[in-house]
Amino acid sequence: MARTTPLERYRNIGICAHVDAGKTTTTERILFYTGLSHKIGETHDGAATMDWMEQEQERGITITSAATTCFWKGMDAQFDAHRINIIDTPGHVDFTIEVERSLRVLDGAVVVLCASSGVQPQTETVWRQANKYEVPRMIFVNKMDRTGADFFAVVDQVKSRLGATPVPIQLPIGAEDGFKGVIDLIKMKAINWNEADQGMTFTYEAIPAELQELADEWRSHLVESAAEATEELMDKYLEGEELSEAEIKEALRQRTLANDIVPMTCGSAFKNKGVQAVLDCVVEYMPAPTQVKQIQGILEDGTEEERPADDKAPFAALAFKIATDPFVGTLTFFRVYSGTVKQGDAVYNPVKSKRERLGRIVQMHSNSREEIKEVFAGDIAAAIGLKDVTTGETLCDPKSIITLERMEFPEPVISVAVEPRTIADQDKMGIALGKLAAEDPSFRVQTDEESGQIIISGMGELHLDILVERMKREFSVECNVGKPQVAYREAIRSTVKVEGKFIRQSGGRGQYGHVWLKLEPMDITDDEAPIYEFVNETVGGSIPKEYVPAVDKGIQEQMSQGVLAGYPLLGVKATLYDGSFHDVDSNEMAFKIAGSLAMKQGALQASPVLLEPVMKVEVLTPEANMGDVVGDLNRRRGMIEGMEDALGGLKQINAQVPLSEMFGYATDLRSATQGRASYSMEFLKYAEASKHVAETIISARAVI
């Protein structure tokens, strides 16, 4: 089977935004206009194609990233068919991991903003993630028909809150109830969509006279932005020559791919206006797989190598999502970066050093499947039946082994205890939790050694609620859920040198391990910094090389148990600088125990402290309620960072608040403001807990 679409006509894009900006509705319209969906699904009817889990349809939010493929030839059929692989990502902050995972494998992103709410907290989070992976992006300002819609205010917010350079390539004609269509600033024509056929057809018309001056002004901004792409264009522009439509588009494309500018369009997905123009922009301004930075990986000998987006190169792909399908079992979504692979081929997973055979390969359309025989560079597909692959692992050609960069996943910040209601639920619960943990790397399962309880941990209350609900729905497991627990951590504040000795010599073969460690605190506020570092500085064979990894292991085991209240220690640099051994009695176990003892004693001497997770909280409230909201945040040990005006006449309060004080906040905020305020929060950092809080927690859980 040969490739049907050339690689330069591929677009791998994500559609991301804040919850409720109209992201899934936009994707539904894309599927409708590209001919994949014969009836438009509305999220408020619970019928959206991309929201295929029952909980998504009930709650009207998107939880998992559904992937789909469609083809587009342009509004005026001006292109050859382009293959667009779309990933619809969740906008709720508890599911940020899904967004991060998608951006890692995408080449471009369409960020959907609400015309009346503008840039919201989750938008900023998504923007930072897209910056991290250098993903070129465009913006679709949706809901232009909503009360309070203001396109130009949103353009200003994109500059001020996202630090981006927006370049509107369309202007709205009217707003709120009077929103009629858009002005195309490149063609300098008005576009009106036909409401009778759900916007399938449209007409180009003259720009309304009252908007001509505004259109001319924004057109000049657009042309100036395009001219900055190259010196030749700038010279042409400065000499007063007109730039052609093709020159403007090519220049905007170059600057978008370099992440210099962000093209902006507008419309109303719900009212079927403006979505086809978004597809045109995806084709014109988003990169093909050949136009992004080539993927880097590490070969078996430790050297780095780039893999080109080319069918002739050796096969290399990244598994970015595992999902359990009720009909076929485990689906492994993967993005092919280079090479091709057929059904039945062997693939190698270098992370687990395992070889597996690719059974069936399917192209996903939301949750329906089409079997395909072969996938090519640039494709996003799903494999059925891979047993040993988890999120973020590489699949490659067994004859050309490479490990692509792994994805980093955040530590969970909230835990609850779950227990099965009946004996029958007990066995099923183990299987269910195992499958859910394989799907979602930000979800952890562990058993509390003291109480024997099963503890599940995740990124927020909604995250855990939905996982418990999925156990009930998909695996028929009924369980009782305990109160939420905060994931505290421990740290040291001073540098110490400490000796660890483990000696047992009472007849026969004994045990002998002796180490000297230097323990130093590390900065844990930096996201990029490691939370543990081990350095071996022993010289002259004071400890044989083969025992050094055992010391490291002993230190890490003790760190996972903590020294104050049983919470893991973070931010320790441990340097092994001396020690001694016994020719007969020394072994790995003895040195592991010696390392563990030294770590425990040293941490207790190094001014240990308790850390608590602190959340970044943003509250949108009417001005009349500001005093109540600020007072309540102060009572919750919150630190108010600032207040600013938000769209829609609201005020935005920015604060840092310990997670332990935020349980039940949604209910309290609703009652304090008669339901008119809303908030969002995301994990910000670990910070030292106050003396009073630390004493309360340590006395309840003392481990010494």
Swiss-Prot record:
GO biological process: ribosome disassembly
Domain of life from the UniProt record: Bacteria
CDD domains, A to Z: EF-G (cd01886), EFG_III (cd16262), EFG_mtEFG1_IV (cd01434), EFG_mtEFG_C (cd03713), EFG_mtEFG_II (cd04088)
Record key words, sorted: Cytoplasm, Elongation factor, GTP-binding, Nucleotide-binding, Protein biosynthesis
Sequence ranges assigned to domain tr-type G in this UniProt record: 8-290
Residues the record lists as binding GTP: 17-24, 88-92, 142-145
An example molecular function term from Gene Ontology annotations: translation elongation factor activity
Stored Pfam families: EFG_C (PF00679), EFG_III (PF14492), EFG_IV (PF03764), GTP_EFTU (PF00009), GTP_EFTU_D2 (PF03144)
Location of this chain's protein in the cell: Cytoplasm
A cellular component term, taken from the record's GO annotations: cytoplasm
Family annotation (InterPro entries): EFG_II, EFG_III, EFG_III/V, EFG_IV, EFG_V, EFG_V-like, EFTu-like_2, G_TR_CS
Keyword field contains rRNA processing: no
Job of this protein: Catalyzes the GTP-dependent ribosomal translocation step during translation elongation. During this step, the ribosome changes from the pre-translocational (PRE) to the post-translocational (POST) state as the newly formed A-site-bound peptidyl-tRNA and P-site-bound deacylated tRNA move to the P and E sites, respectively. Catalyzes the coordinated movement of the two tRNA molecules, the mRNA and conformational changes in the ribosome.
Protein family: Belongs to the TRAFAC class translation factor GTPase superfamily. Classic translation factor GTPase family. EF-G/EF-2 subfamily.
Name the record gives this protein: Elongation factor G 1
Organism per entry: Pseudoalteromonas translucida (strain TAC 125)
Gene it is expressed from: fusA1
